[in-house]
Amino acid sequence: GLTFAAEAGTQRLRDVINKNVTWEQIERGCRIAFSEGYTSVKLYFMMGLPTETMEDIKGIADTAQQVVDLFYQIPDRPKGKGVQVTISVACFVPKPDTPFQFCAQDRREALQEKQKYLLSCVHSRKIKVNYHDSATSVLEGVFAKGDRRLGKVIETAFENGAFFDTWEEYFNYDRWMDAFAACGIDPDFYNYRTIALDEVTPWAHLDVGVSHAHLVREYQKALQAQTTPPCNRQCSACGANKLIGGPCFDYHQDLL
């Protein structure tokens, strides 16, 4: 099947994350796919996005149901076959050097509650829901925005038997929590709090080209659900052009 990355269940939340995709575009893509013989599609979403509400979670199920309904509205759809729509939901992890680096990550309990609510919103057997383990996402959030003190935590967890942890059968969340406790480190400090806009972060000394001021601007726009056009349409003064010594694009030409 084909995968469509809608990212969020409502247009409001897609605007927050600057995902310039509309339902009309998703519908058009699915319509073409079904007309060409496809009977299964995957819709990719994220859960735990900044400003997210339960209405946005319900929107994930609603979008999938709209795709199911669309299949049966197409006259030249594959005959004799049903449609299968798979919802794949990842847990959002705020990352350094992005506008959402300032955001707190959803707590594990909140993510689990949203996962259960999403399942309750799906009423069709033609819709399947897959979601990422919230525990691994929480750890990813800690190490994504962590500092060098976490090196000891990793070493301690390894000494206690943590390895191949990306494999579900090897992963043990409690082992990691024990390692944090043994090192006297509170993991909540790293991923469950909002970072002040002027805070010196563990990665502030690294220059990736994009300026801190740009990240702040984009973060503030995101909270207002204001989108930013693509770079080839309008320069947002992110600062990356300093790495190449000139303009990033020829703005007199449209890029495909």
Q: How would you name each of these model-derived features?
A:
Residues H123-L256:
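Radical SAM enzyme core and accessory elements
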Residues G29-I32, Y72-R77, L118, E140-V142, ...:
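Generic recognition of flexible, low-complexity loop/linker segments
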Residues Y72-P78, Y117-D133:
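Flexible helix-coil linker/hinge segments at domain or subdomain boundaries
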Residues G1-A5, S40-Y44, T86-V89, N130, ...:
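Structured core elements
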Residues V83-V93, N241:
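Core structural elements
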Residues G37-T39, K81-V85, R125-I127:
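Short, well-ordered coil/turn segments that N-cap beta-strands
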Residues G1-K79, T98-Q112:
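Conserved non-cysteine loop/helix-boundary elements of the Radical SAM core domain that shape
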Residues V89-P99, A135-F143:
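Short, conserved secondary-structure transition motifs
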